[in-house]
Amino acid sequence: MSFDIAKYPTLALVDSTQELRLLPKESLPKLCDELRRYLLDSVSRSSGHFASGLGTVELTVALHYVYNTPFDQLIWDVGHQAYPHKILTGRRDKIGTIRQKGGLHPFPWRGESEYDVLSVGHSSTSISAGIGIAVAAEKEGKNRRTVCVIGDGAITAGMAFEAMNHAGDIRPDMLVVLNDNEMSISENVGALNNHLAQLLSGKLYSSLREGGKKVFSGVPPIKELLKRTEEHIKGMVVPGTLFEELGFNYIGPVDGHDVLGLITTLKNMRDLKGPQFLHIMTKKGRGYEPAEKDPITFHAVPKFDPSSGCLPKSSGGLPSYSKIFGDWLCETAAKDNKLMAITPAMREGSGMVEFSRKFPDRYFDVAIAEQHAVTFAAGLAIGGYKPIVAIYSTFLQRAYDQVLHDVAIQKLPVLFAIDRAGIVGADGQTHQGAFDLSYLRCIPEMVIMTPSDENECRQMLYTGYHYNDGPSAVRYPRGNAVGVELTPLEKLPIGKGIVKRRGEKLAILNFGTLMPDAAKVAESLNATLVDMRFVKPLDEALILEMAASHEALVTVEENAIMGGAGSGVNEVLMAHRKPVPVLNIGLPDFFIPQGTQEEMRAELGLDAAGMEAKIKAWLA
């Protein structure tokens, strides 16, 4: 979309933060209004993360107005809320390409702009990185300031508290801004806090505070009285005790939609020494009523008509794999009251909404706490229950030690339902489920299954749920199922694949949901096609049979080739001294960028045409 200067006259004056800082303060509320409307206009046309950015417009304007970015370093946690930041930092006219192949990255990305200090996508990393950046800036000695913006969801993760605990110890000069969009505060309390925040962050108060500490440092009772008086004044209206105890100077909560008030407070806090904490209250979806009322639905949106106030309904076609999992979960829970389901803040994405409503006493959303989720599941298993951890492939990485140390070593029967395995599409490098087979396959006695369709997915979930000799995992992709008939649930024989088609000379060993394309290739090349089903334990007898009866083997998986299922096949052949040629097809040794799943599979040669071309070139 082209930028309409007439529609956004103030925003038209701002294509960089230098231009932003030339505007008079009085024009900033109008700029915020135009920025919010432009965000609505552009994202509704292109798709993308939506509600979070609407809530951070004033904060973004205020931060770039007060701080000398990019010299001063601004770090966004996760990045869902950073669209206004991108618009104000030279990417205004490209915002319509966000999350598209070759377009703007969906999150702040160091390779895209000097304003993007930290590449992000996963949560709760900003404060840790910010401390390191602040320490480096202090050693550099150029008076460079550091600001981290983190949301109320991300700050609940243990990593954020580990970082704040460290900051309180080494006391770097930095500001943490908590963007709190979960609570609401009355106008009176909000006004009082705004006024108090400006007083408490001002130079006069800060100098008196430090001076008082020095004067009365030798008089412990008076020093303690002053401390308690300050805490009492703050405690009447603010919930900052925790952050103060961690060593931060806490200011807030303040109205995050009052751009002029934010500027005053930020200017006051900019030159304060030590770790500072500003708590702002915002409304997710601010300025677009449907998103304000339902911020979860409008968190990330497809293309839609803003005038309709609703998102387009799905076509009513095939169910997603997440839906298949959710239905199986409810079906199984109705028959077994030992089932417990756990998610780290991904209820909607993992297909668990219905389960959470039907079985609230057996549903646990542990927030953004993947490590805790896995060890919590271990505890449930020790207590005699049957825990299922529903988690995205990319987020399971964050709990690897817990899988290994707290579950696998103890041979606990925890089932991992790994969603978004393989290529996920528009979220790019940080969210591709490229590595789970590689990092799980090396764990002793772990059972790993890769369904080729939705019926196999259900059977594998059932098999894993009833496997009691240790942990098991079923990995399935983002997107819709293929439309096969769902048969009654039954346990699969562990570690056994099945031959789907008999051919000559070439055998294709398929792992997972690339099966439809692999089947087309097998038909075209008259190759044998095997649905391996299990990555661990591998069906060694079937692999050796294929090696003995064919001239060459091809393995197919939507996982990194290095350490993946194909590597496992290679290991089996080498261990048995079977020098048959093997071509491993999978994800290459680089981080897969954004694009639709179809676009990226075609580019990487993981669709039928690409696979066939690779095989023919290899055989030539």
Swiss-Prot record:
Binds 1 Mg(2+) ion per subunit. Binds 1 thiamine pyrophosphate per subunit. It catalyses: D-glyceraldehyde 3-phosphate + pyruvate + H(+) = 1-deoxy-D-xylulose 5-phosphate + CO2. It comes from the Bacteria. Its EC number is 2.2.1.7. GO terms for cellular component: cytosol. The keyword DNA-binding does not apply. Pathway: Metabolic intermediate biosynthesis; 1-deoxy-D-xylulose 5-phosphate biosynthesis; 1-deoxy-D-xylulose 5-phosphate from D-glyceraldehyde 3-phosphate and pyruvate: step 1/1. Transmembrane segments: none annotated. The keyword Kinase does not apply. Its cofactor is Mg(2+); thiamine diphosphate. GO terms for molecular function: 1-deoxy-D-xylulose-5-phosphate synthase activity; magnesium ion binding; thiamine pyrophosphate binding. Keywords: Isoprene biosynthesis, Magnesium, Metal-binding, Thiamine biosynthesis, Thiamine pyrophosphate, Transferase. Thiamine diphosphate binds at H80, G121, H122, S123, G153, A154, N181, Y288, E370. Mg(2+) binds at D152, N181. GO terms for biological process: 1-deoxy-D-xylulose 5-phosphate biosynthetic process; isopentenyl diphosphate biosynthetic process, methylerythritol 4-phosphate pathway; terpenoid biosynthetic process; thiamine biosynthetic process. Homodimer. HAMAP family: DXP_synth. Catalyzes the acyloin condensation reaction between C atoms 2 and 3 of pyruvate and glyceraldehyde 3-phosphate to yield 1-deoxy-D-xylulose-5-phosphate (DXP). Belongs to the transketolase family. DXPS subfamily. This is 1-deoxy-D-xylulose-5-phosphate synthase. It comes from Escherichia coli O139:H28 (strain E24377A / ETEC). The lineage of its organism: Bacteria, Pseudomonadati, Pseudomonadota, Gammaproteobacteria, Enterobacterales.
